[in-house]
Amino acid sequence: MASSLMSNAATTMAAATTTAQANMVAPFNGLKSISAFPVTRKNNDITSVASNGGRVQCMVWPPLGMKKFETLSYLPPLSEESLLKEVQYLLNNGWVPCLEFEPTHGFVYREHGNTPGYYDGRYWTMWKLPMFGCTDPSQVVAELEEAKKAYPEAFIRIIGFDNVRQVQCVSFIAYKPASYGA
């Protein structure tokens, strides 16, 4: 009997505690003052965004005699080892290597007016056929050497073509003529 009295007392006390907790809600004191929140001020000064240890300097690329075009054209001429690595990248992605050359204009140019057009030097002549089934980068470099001998004054580029999606995925200049000078 003593145990049943204790359990009844414990049950009554637990019920009273949960009822009291359910009825306790913090009173609404109104909106908080904005001065209670930390404020960060935005600085509209451009020099605070970029820092090179002092003042910000900009470089202007000389526009005359230093035309740049295509991917990798800002780099020095690629060595044979670098070319082999680039072609291996194409092959690893499942793209078909293809060579194109342009004997007169290596740049986009306006041939038929001063507004952009469809044939503004974007289309080059294909060297032979795309190299479907090629698995060795040295085959592509050998074709590049053959194209250089046939057209020593032409720009030659290597293209990675995705024959499933029917798109050109990558293109870079592999050879610039000696007369170009840069």
UniProtKB/Swiss-Prot annotation:
SUPFAM superfamilies: RuBisCO, small subunit. One of its GO terms (cellular component) is chloroplast. Pfam families: RbcS, RuBisCO_small. GO terms for biological process: photorespiration; reductive pentose-phosphate cycle. The keyword S-adenosyl-L-methionine does not apply. Induction: No expression of this mRNA was seen in leaves. Keywords: Calvin cycle, Carbon dioxide fixation, Chloroplast, Photorespiration, Photosynthesis, Plastid, Transit peptide. InterPro entries: RuBisCO_ssu (IPR024681), RuBisCO_ssu_dom (IPR000894), RuBisCO_ssu_N (IPR024680), RuBisCO_ssu_sf (IPR036385). CDD domains: RuBisCO_small (cd03527). Residues 1-49 form a transit peptide. Its main location: plastid. It is found in: Plastid, Chloroplast. One of its GO terms (molecular function) is ribulose-bisphosphate carboxylase activity. Heterohexadecamer of 8 large and 8 small subunits. Belongs to the RuBisCO small chain family. The basic functional RuBisCO is composed of a large chain homodimer in a 'head-to-tail' conformation. In form I RuBisCO this homodimer is arranged in a barrel-like tetramer with the small subunits forming a tetrameric 'cap' on each end of the 'barrel'. RuBisCO catalyzes two reactions: the carboxylation of D-ribulose 1,5-bisphosphate, the primary event in carbon dioxide fixation, as well as the oxidative fragmentation of the pentose substrate. Both reactions occur simultaneously and in competition at the same active site. Although the small subunit is not catalytic it is essential for maximal activity. This is Ribulose bisphosphate carboxylase small subunit, chloroplastic 5. It comes from Mesembryanthemum crystallinum. The lineage of its organism: Eukaryota, Viridiplantae, Streptophyta, Embryophyta, Tracheophyta. The gene is RBCS5.
